[in-house]
Regions:
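Residue cluster at the C-terminal edge of the helix-turn-helix DNA-binding motif
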Residues: 61, 297, 396-401, 409, ...
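Pre-recognition alpha-helix immediately N-terminal to the DNA-recognition helix
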Residues: 257, 361-362, 405
Length: 419
């Protein structure tokens, strides 16, 4: 992105903006009704891009300028904002507000989750001293200020995700095109990446050196190849793991422990599942409040029907020992050596891993990835009723009550098939 002069300092986006029509409309409504709005969501979901797109659309409404202060690398948002506004570096928050008092500016305070208290204090002073100013904040959790509106960004729906992949792939390889052969592969790539724009953009850049089907096969096993090469983005946005680790580093010890424990649960889960996963590691009464903190910080997403879900990139970080390269989640114990209790035979002895056939082992591993029975049938090119039978056998052999427990069993075991 290049900077331009004018009424503000917004960067010019050199790539197309894909999707988010409903979110942009909601953001415009929020800023009609309120003076401060926070754009929240998980790592790589596009908070900065969406906030800057909104600000660009609002230039005419804010003749005092649309200004961005990028705060990820600072603990002093006041000085950073003063520099962005071309005011003296020694300006206080109230002095900045006073300088804006007779103007109607829109200020974007970008990436604030690491200094929420400082940014909240700055925002309060600006709103008090500059009654015509409005503020857009980006971060992985709201500031919690009176009158604050929240624009929650979810991963892209499949149609927009595929469009984004196609656009970014064609940018690096004009020969790339969606065809009847490649479209299903790209759709599966986008689904495996949970519709995260950052992950999709990083993956799309690889089509100049990899076929789409080879990229999909790599993503089935590891995410380490999702490292960007662009020097125009922040370091944490050049690597999917780095983006997620930014969130991990902001969590306290209790939140990190729950993050690791929940990583063994594939797909969606309920509070009861979370408590079961934490048995022996985290007191039962602490699970709900700590889980609420992870939801607030966009580590865990709320699903319909009082369910929760952790994106695959977050699961992989939670299952990876600190400092180790990513490996398939099912091959790794939980962080810190903690393990979920394995299913037991009536006598109390853990069932041997070798009770699964080779095909049942394949199905069990796909269950840990969150795939439904119809999806497993497509992946393995077998009938759904065959998958149903395999799942019943897995549950029976493991003494398991639900699919959620399959992940813990697979993650804990070394699993060599009995064939």
């Amino acid at each position: 992105m290049n900077m331009v002069r004018g009424p503000g300092n917004l960067p010019v986006d050199l790539s197309s903006f894909v999707g988010r029509a409903e979110e942009l409309a909601e953001g415009l409504r929020h800023l009609t009704e309120a003076r401060i709005m926070t754009v929240t969501g998980p790592a790589g979901v596009g908070k900065t891009r969406t906030a800057l797109r909104l600000a660009a659309r609002l230039r005419r409404r804010f003749p005092g300028g649309t200004w961005r202060a990028e705060l990820s690398g600072t603990a002093d948002p006041v000085t950073t904002l003063a520099e962005a506004l071309e005011l003296p570096r020694t300006s206080s928050a109230r002095e900045i507000g006073a300088a804006l008092r007779e103007r109607r500016p829109l200020v974007v305070l970008d990436t604030c989750e690491h200094i929420p208290g400082e940014v909240a204090a700055l925002a309060e002073d600006l709103l008090a001293e500059a009654p015509r100013a409005a503020i857009v904040v980006t971060g992985r959790r709201p500031l919690g200020l009176p009158g604050e509106r929240v624009l929650q960004l979810a991963p892209l729906p499949l149609t927009s995700a595929v469009r984004l992949f196609e656009d970014r792939a064609m940018a690096v390889d004009p020969r790339f095109a969606l065809t009847p052969a490649t479209a299903p592969i790209v759709a599966e790539i986008c689904g495996r990446l949970d519709g995260l724009p950052l992950a999709i953009e990083l993956a799309a850049t690889l089509v100049r050196s990899m076929l789409a089907r080879d990229l999909l096969e790599e993503l089935r096993h590891r995410f380490t190849l999702l490292t960007g090469v662009s020097r125009t983005v922040l370091p944490r946005h050049r690597d999917l793991r780095a983006a997620v680790m930014w969130s991990y580093d902001l969590c306290d010890a209790e939140q990190r422990e729950l993050w690791a424990l929940l990583s063994a649960l594939p797909g969606s889960f309920g509070l009861a599942d979370a408590r079961a996963a934490c048995r022996g590691h985290l007191p039962g009464e602490r699970v709900a409040p700590v889980l609420a903190k992870l939801v607030e910080g966009s580590v865990v997403l709320r699903e319909p029907g009082e369910r929760y879900r952790m994106l695959e990139a977050y699961r992989r970080v939670g299952l990876e020992p600190s400092g180790s390269p990513w490996r398939p989640a099912v091959q790794r114990p939980l962080r810190g050596g903690g393990r979920l209790p394995s299913p037991r035979q009536p006598g109390g002895t853990a069932r041997p891993a070798g009770t699964l056939s080779a095909r049942e082992l394949q199905v069990a591993k796909l269950i840990t990835e969150g795939l439904s029975n119809p999806e497993i049938a497509v992946r393995l090119d077998i009938a759904k009723r065959t998958v149903d039978a395999h799942v019943r056998n897995i549950l029976a052999k493991g003494g398991l009550a639900s699919r959620t427990q399959v992940a813990a069993w697979v993650a804990e075991s070394d699993y060599q098939s009995s064939t």
